[in-house]
Amino acid sequence: MPPSNDDLEGARIMVKLDDLLYARRMTLTELADRVGLTLANLSILKTGKAKAIRFSTLAAICRELDCQPGDLLGYKAD
């Protein structure tokens, strides 16, 4: 049985997009253009406010940043 929302309270997925962009010397605007997302949607992801991400979006970001999903996302339990 999957964990309930109560079991996950305090746990969160961390998005490490800032670190990857800095390492690649790429702006958020440039990445948005390359992956076909609006700057607003990519900003929501970058700030950790996104509730979900499509695999196709994740794949496009990883393609452009030359990284693996685990380089972009992390899990933190409280």
Protein language model features and the residues they cover:
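The alpha-helix within a helix-turn-helix
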Residues: 21, 32, 62
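Short amphipathic recognition helices of helix-turn-helix/homeodomain-type DNA-binding modules
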Residues: 71-78
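Residue at a beta-strand N-cap/secondary-structure junction
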Residues: 25, 52-55
